[in-house]
Amino acid sequence: MERTFNNNFGLSDNLPGGGNPISMDAIEEVQVVIAPFDVRQTNFIGGGINAITKSGTNTFKGSAYTYFQNQNMRGNSIDGEDLGARAKESKTIYGATFGGPIIKNKLFFFANVEVEKQPQQVIKWRARTEGEQPDENNYISRTTLSDMQKVSDFLRDKYGYDTGSATNFPADEKNLKLLGRIDWNITNGHKLSVRYNYTKNTAWNAPNANSMDGGSGSRLYNTSRVGYQSMSFANSMYSQDNKVSSVSADLNSRFSDKISNQLLFTYTDIEDMRGTNSSPFPFIDILAGKDAEGNQIMEPYMSAGYELFTYNNGVKNKITSVIDNFTYFAGDHKITAGISFEHQLASNAYMRNGTGYYRYSSLDDFLNGAAPETFAWTYGYNGVSDPKAQVTFNQIGFYAQDEWNIRPNVKLTYGIRFDDLIFDNSDLQRNDAIYDLDFGGKHIDTGKWPKSRMQISPRVGFVWDVFKDNSLKVRGGTGIFTGRLPLVFFTNMPTNSNMVQNAVVFGTKYENGIAVSHDSRLDQLAGGMITNVDDAIKKFGLPTTIENPVAGSKISGVKDNFKMPQIWKTSLAVDYQLPTSFPLSVTGEFIYNKNINAVTLENINIKDPSNWEHFNGADNRLIYPSDYTYVSGKNAVVLTNTSKGHGYTANVTINAQPVEDLNMMLAYTHTESKEISGLPGSDPVSTWQGMLTIDGPNFATVQRSRYVVPDKVIAAVNYNLPFRHKGLLRKTSLNLFYPVIPLPDIASLIQMI
């Protein structure tokens, strides 16, 4: 049974579930594909990993295992330079598998459970006690424990809010994996496999370091809410909770010697949400008061409350997929035709200050009920408590291919695939204020997705067994592959359309500690905080519906003719089994890639530079005029395509088994990749600005990819030590893995089964 888990949204580097969604001990076989010329495989342009999970047999089998790793099991030097004392760290994994027959030869089961624990200390700092002095070397903050106790008691007595501990900050990371599989031999010609797996990963974090709204900038003056100058409480921490639930059913049918069919259904529910131990309550920053001259000290002293970026912050992704492959065997031909359907919904919720935000000038101001110097709240329109940006689409694919055994030692595979991506516009609302902006004749419509466009992927591949004994094989092919784009780049459009939620900020601005402007509405908050959003809306007469939408400074869009990424791949490889007394093979492979529809970003508010001047001499960069934009103060960044970019990979791999139970591998890979942009981020404006250019992001040229590793060596050794004890077969495996030449760090792992 094959199933691929994708990080569809793309806000993190990890796979769904915060890592591997399935335990390695539940996997029977892993297939890595880089250039498969089988048209049944799609939705990737770099590579794909397919996993076949273990199944039960007629024999009851079980295993128990544990992994342990700490700071002493990794290297500690680079180029001969010792990095000093290693911070304490540990990771422990416990797991078990069990499988067997329910009805012999008919019905089988397999189950796996795995738990991973990593003790963490995300907050090393502590508040100082009476008689202590602040000490950076020993992580003692200037904030006093007695002041923290005053704030905690005050919030409990006046508002009924529990701040959590001021001295204990538990933050252990936990991961749970469950998998169950049933295999049913319905008849000799029909077999059904059903799998369910669940993964949950929880990792705790300290509150955001210094981001804020209002005031004289977007940061708390380059300091941190937890550190030498300031402390926070345990309930202001937040967790990153990653959950994956997936079920799949695979029905394989053989109707005759010439006709077979595979029907595969999968449903996956992925959630990456923030969690907290806090009840809903405003987040509070308390500044350090005033200096001897009466000027405001622009540094934090203490924070409390529901972490300001956690409420309704998360990504949800639901995928339903149905695939049917029909195969007909006609002599030397294996003809396959298929259809695939995928429905996908992705939502992104992000409400900074979703429970309210207050910033006070000093501890005394806060405790005595003075007006705050900043107030902020983000809330959903029409009473919606969990507003979110959403994208929904259906993908329909049709394909056909023929595997032709031209000769007993030559096989040719050729086929074609058609994929159509259809977006659902009902998720969107047009912001007329954005649409009315004229960017040199171009407009951004936040009320519709790109039009449906069929994408075609023809492919052809071959395998030639030169001597008809598998000792020398030549293989290769060429074709087009269609992939996906992280969905965060789509949800940026409704997120930045100002049609989802309303953000309110009342602030005070300072220059050198002296207030130069003050929002008078802050004075209405003297006497105590408003802790309910409905009360805040009523008190300040805030809008509850979208009355007069405005265009923000950051505008996101998707070009109407946008296409999912496509790449043309060509590969040639040679596999050679050397005539030795033990298995020894060498593989050489070369892959060339050329972009057809790569993805990049364009700021359509930038004017045509054809009439702009250049610097003189060697530095002939463009000189931007003062009126280089169509609309002042706006960034209008849209997703678009480019055909620029190419690359290649050359690899040599040696595999050997010099003695029984000893497997060795050595591989060298050289890679070159040129592109316009690797999309280094998730925010459209910052990603566009982060493009490496000479004349500006809109005029970027092809350059080496920032993600390419030009040269890499991998070596691996695996040795199995089987032994029997009281009739039970046990095995000890020793694995050594040497990852990359620039990082001489050998990690060892011992597994007891």
Question: Where on the chain are the PLM-derived regions?
Answer:
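Solvent-exposed loop/turn elements at secondary-structure boundaries
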Residues: D427-S457, G461-V638, I753
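Hydrophobic, lipid-facing positions within transmembrane beta-strands of outer-membrane proteins
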Residues: I45-G47, T92-A96, L176-G180, K243-A249, ...
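Gram-negative outer-membrane beta-barrel transporters
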Residues: S585-L728, F737-P742
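Transmembrane beta-barrel strands of outer-membrane/channel proteins
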Residues: A64-N70, A111-V115, V194-Y198, L263-D269, ...
